[in-house]
């Protein structure tokens, strides 16, 4: 029995030795792995490269699996041990299933019982082409063309060696790409580190002081906030300057703006103001420069009331009184010669520089005409010199009269009892006869007149008087000039210190053409 038992294992061993299957693939040329059309099929370069890097088959052959496992040295040993284990495991399965049939048949369940060592999960492509490795560089590599070198023959390099070389090149390309990406990111990280170090150094600078950091930060915040508020205030003042430019300098009186006029060549209009005190006829005109600054203030008339006091602002009233005192001091020399005669009448010698003032049109009770805009320049310059008249006065104010006298005479200059000096002449548009300008020769008398002949009637002489005389009619020099009666209240006498003449003199409004 012992011999039989010894023979049976020997027979079993012999039978297993005969029926053991051999997993070996038929010899396959090396070039067939790059294309699936057979040996006679010659694909293009792109097809060759695509077949090299990807394989559509889900289950690889043993040679391809072994070649993929060779990419890592550790997997090679595991793959070798797995092949031996598969060979021993496959023998009883085939003998039981086939009853000791031919060893060429392999159980179809072989792929299901494949050891885990050979179950290599791979992406759709066998290799991932790195950014640094292109198909052109792969084709130009000497190792790729060495596969088909005539010196080595068709099988100069094995399948495993070729795949190992391509894998090494791919890994090297991946390493180069990773190094480049790290170098490109390195400067940004260093800059961030430098900024963090600078911030840390700035926060650590005040550590030597005795004050805590919270106080230092609070002081820094207050300083920055103060600078910001200062810049905002400067911007606000810069923006609000054009808005406040419409308000002239405060002279102590209350004014109400009643009109303005656009000046040619300037963005800022000419403003007209009137004193807000009841029954006060004082008005003023404010001229501005191109940048909005007040360049000239022209006053007309005198205040018949005292300087008003500011409500709840003592400083403002003091400033107003100081300004009024300055006006009085600067014009004290002009007031000395007039104070003796102001008890009976008060005259004003202020003249407007242009005739477009709207305040003169509204004074119908004392003015029957309009100011000529075409007066000569000497008169205008003299008028501007007289701008600074005293504004702080409690006397009664009398506005300037403007009277037009039209007579028929062969002589242009009529004898009205006063002495005149001619200071200019001008040709009026639409009138062939010139206009002559005269000024009273009495000192400190600002009365003027201009004489012209009517364009429609050459014998009609039009004489326009401006202002009132602040003196009596001077005595006649010779008897030849006694053309006027001695009675000053005669209706033929034009005397502006008393009642206005109403006899032969016809008053009319002057029409400027």
UniProtKB/Swiss-Prot annotation:
Gene Ontology cellular component list: nucleus
Compositional bias segments (type: Low complexity): 179-201
4Fe-4S is among the record's keywords: no
Biased composition (Polar residues): 202-228, 311-335, 343-355
Induction conditions: By salicylic acid and during leaf senescence.
Subcellular location(s) per record: Nucleus
UniProt keyword Repeat, yes or no: yes
GO MF term set: DNA-binding transcription factor activity; transcription cis-regulatory region binding
Composition skew (Basic and acidic residues), residue ranges: 1-11, 229-240, 368-387
One Pfam family, short name: WRKY
DNA-binding region: 244-308, 409-474
SUPFAM superfamilies for the chain: WRKY DNA-binding domain
Region (Disordered): 1-26, 175-281, 297-394
PROSITE patterns: WRKY
InterPro entries the UniProt entry points to: WRKY_dom (IPR003657), WRKY_dom_sf (IPR036576), WRKY_plant (IPR044810)
UniProt keyword terms in alphabetical order: DNA-binding, Nucleus, Repeat, Transcription, Transcription regulation
Distribution of this protein across tissues and organs: In young, mature and senescent leaves.
Purpose: Transcription factor. Interacts specifically with the W box (5'-(T)TGAC[CT]-3'), a frequently occurring elicitor-responsive cis-acting element.
Protein name from the UniProt record: Probable WRKY transcription factor 3
Organism: Arabidopsis thaliana (Mouse-ear cress)
Gene symbol of the encoding locus: WRKY3
